[in-house]
C-alpha cells in the first residue's frame, strides 16, 4: 500500500486553485453550467475528421467525448493519473524508512501530497483544456477535458466570444488526441523517458523539511478550518519553487535533469504542431 496522502493532495490543490496573484481569492463564480458548454454542438468527431484530412493522422479508436469540468474535478482527474507514477516512488521511499516510526512514514506521504497538490492547484488556474492520457497505465481511457471556469475567465479577460474560444481550444485538444492516437509510438516514447525519471527519483524528509511540512499541514486545515491568511505566504513560496522547477530539480538531482529537458523538447514539438493545426483547421 502506498504512503502518499491523496486526500491531502486534493485538499491542498483546491486551496491553491483559489490563489490569484499574491492574494487569496475564491474560485471564479463561473461553473460548468454557467459557461453552457454543449459538447454535442462542438462536434468533436467532425473536427477530428477535418484534422485527419489536414494531417493524415487517423486514430483507430476515434476521439474521446468532450467533458466540461470545474477546477476541483480537473485536479481530481490529474491526481488519478499521477497515482501509477508516484505510488512506486512512495513504496521505495517507505521501504527505505526501516525502523522509523509510523509518524515519519505519514510525514513522507504528506510531503509528496502537499507538493503534488500545490502543483495541480497552480496548474488548475491556467489550463483551458486538456487531452488527459495516462502514459504508464494503458487501462484508463484518455479524456478530453474543458475547464469551464478558466475558459469563462479567459474569454472575459481577452474580450473574445466564449463559443469561439471554446471551439479553438477544442480543436487544439482534439489535435492532441489524434497525435497520440495516430502515432502510437509517441506515447511509448514519452513513457520510456518518464519511467527512467521515476526510477531515479528519491524523496527524503529531513528535520527542516518536516518542520516546514508540519507548518503547512497545520495551516491547511486538513482537520478543521484553514488559516487562509497565514497559509498564503507559505503556499506562494511553494508555488514559486514549482514554477521555476526548483522542486523537481531538487527531487531529481542534476544528473537526471537532462531527461526533463528531453521531455520538454518533445512536448514543445507536440504543442507547436497542435498550434499550427489549430490555426490551419480553425481558420
Where on the chain are the PLM-derived regions?
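Auxiliary, metal-adjacent structural segments of Zn-dependent hydrolase domains
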Residues: 43-149
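Post-HExxH zinc-binding segment in Zn-dependent metallohydrolases
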Residues: 113, 117-128, 181-282
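Short helix/loop capping segments that flank catalytic or ligand/cofactor-binding pockets
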Residues: 154-156, 178-179, 188
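Acidic, low-complexity proline/glycine-rich segments
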Residues: 2-15, 128-147, 235, 239-242
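Active-site recognition of the HExxH zinc-binding catalytic motif
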Residues: 165-181
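Short, solvent-exposed segments of well-ordered alpha helices
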Residues: 31-34, 38, 161, 257-261, ...
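Short pre-active-site segment immediately N-terminal to the catalytic Zn-binding motif
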Residues: 150-169
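N-terminal low-complexity, Ser/Thr- and acidic-residue-enriched intrinsically disordered segments
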Residues: 1-56, 60, 64-65
Amino acid at each position: 500500500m502506498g504512503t502518499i496522502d491523496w486526500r491531502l493532495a486534493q485538499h491542498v490543490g483546491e486551496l491553491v486553485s483559489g490563489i490569484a496573484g499574491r492574494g487569496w481569492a475564491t474560485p471564479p463564480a463561473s461553473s460548468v453550467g454557467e459557461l453552457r458548454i454543449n459538447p454535442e454542438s462542438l462536434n468533436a468527431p467532425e473536427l477530428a475528421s477535418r484534422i485527419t484530412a489536414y494531417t493524415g493522422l487517423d486514430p483507430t479508436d476515434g476521439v474521446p467525448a468532450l467533458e466540461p469540468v470545474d477546477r476541483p474535478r480537473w485536479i481530481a482527474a490529474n491526481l488519478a493519473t499521477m497515482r501509477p507514477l508516484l505510488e512506486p516512488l512512495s513504496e521505495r521511499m517507505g521501504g527505505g524508512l526501516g525502523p522509523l516510526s509510523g509518524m515519519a512514514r505519514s510525514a513522507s506521504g504528506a510531503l509528496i501530497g502537499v507538493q503534488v497538490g500545490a502543483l495541480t492547484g497552480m496548474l488548475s488556474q491556467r489550463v483551458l483544456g486538456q487531452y488527459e492520457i495516462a502514459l504508464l497505465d494503458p487501462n484508463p481511457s484518455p479524456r478530453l477535458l474543458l475547464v469551464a471556469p478558466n475558459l469563462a475567465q479567459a474569454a472575459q479577460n481577452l474580450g473574445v466570444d466564449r463559443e469561439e474560444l471554446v471551439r479553438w481550444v477544442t480543436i487544439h485538444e482534439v489535435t492532441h488526441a489524434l497525435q497520440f492516437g495516430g502515432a502510437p509510438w509517441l506515447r511509448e516514447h514519452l513513457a520510456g523517458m518518464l519511467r527512467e525519471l521515476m526510477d531515479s527519483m528519491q524523496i527524503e524528509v529531513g528535520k527542516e523539511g518536516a518542520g516546514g511540512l508540519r507548518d503547512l499541514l497545520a495551516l491547511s486545515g486538513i482537520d478543521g478550518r484553514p488559516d487562509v491568511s497565514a497559509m498564503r505566504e507559505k503556499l506562494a513560496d511553494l508555488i514559486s519553487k514549482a514554477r521555476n522547477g526548483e522542486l523537481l530539480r531538487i527531487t531529481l538531482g542534476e544528473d537526471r535533469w537532462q531527461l526533463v529537458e528531453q521531455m520538454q523538447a518533445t512536448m514543445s514539438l507536440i504543442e507547436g504542431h497542435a498550434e499550427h493545426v489549430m490555426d490551419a483547421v480553425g481558420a
